[in-house]
């Protein structure tokens, strides 16, 4: 598992450098986390080489997924959808290649079941929270920055837009 995380971090770093012209630590950290997420689907069967291959593929995938979601204007500030959703699905689909007891169709059904469960429960949870308090900050608070609006100070004063 640690090999996958390490390879994913390095691959994500290289993919970010290729895509943006500079190394991106956040992408590397998301790559490391993504490696651990993907290998969790079937950690006992991949060989070290297979774990390395899955890691390399996922490192590039997490960067591409984050960029795609940004272009689609899907609000995912920390890359959670890419790390846990996109790369988690990759991990599910990789299991049959390293475990003869698993099938692609079974993994696809499992992935669809997970998606439906998470979507429905998240939707209902946010609707219930919305009855009690706003789920999103106002436009004014967003422009000001949530750290200032909610805490009264800047979380990262060294970063100015």
Across the structure, where does each feature detected by a protein language model lie?
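Glycine- and aromatic-enriched membrane alpha-helices
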Residues: 1-161
């Amino acid at each position: 598992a640690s090999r996958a995380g390490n390879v994913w971090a390095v691959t994500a770093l290289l993919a970010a450098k290729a895509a943006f012209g500079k190394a991106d630590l956040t992408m590397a950290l998301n790559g490391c986390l993504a490696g651990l997420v993907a290998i969790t689907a079937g950690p006992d069967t991949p060989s070290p080489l297979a774990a390395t291959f899955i890691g390399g593929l996922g490192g590039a995938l997490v960067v591409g997924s984050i960029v795609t979601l940004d272009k689609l204007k899907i609000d995912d500030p920390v890359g959670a959808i890419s790390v846990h959703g996109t790369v988690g699905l990759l991990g599910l689909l990789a299991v049959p290649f390293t475990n003869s007891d698993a099938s692609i169709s079974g993994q696809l059904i499992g992935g669809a079941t997970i998606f439906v469960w998470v979507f429905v429960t998240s939707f209902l949870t946010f609707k219930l929270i919305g009855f009690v308090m706003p789920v999103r900050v106002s436009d004014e608070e967003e422009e000001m920055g949530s750290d200032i609006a909610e805490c009264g100070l800047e979380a990262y004063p060294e970063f100015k837009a």
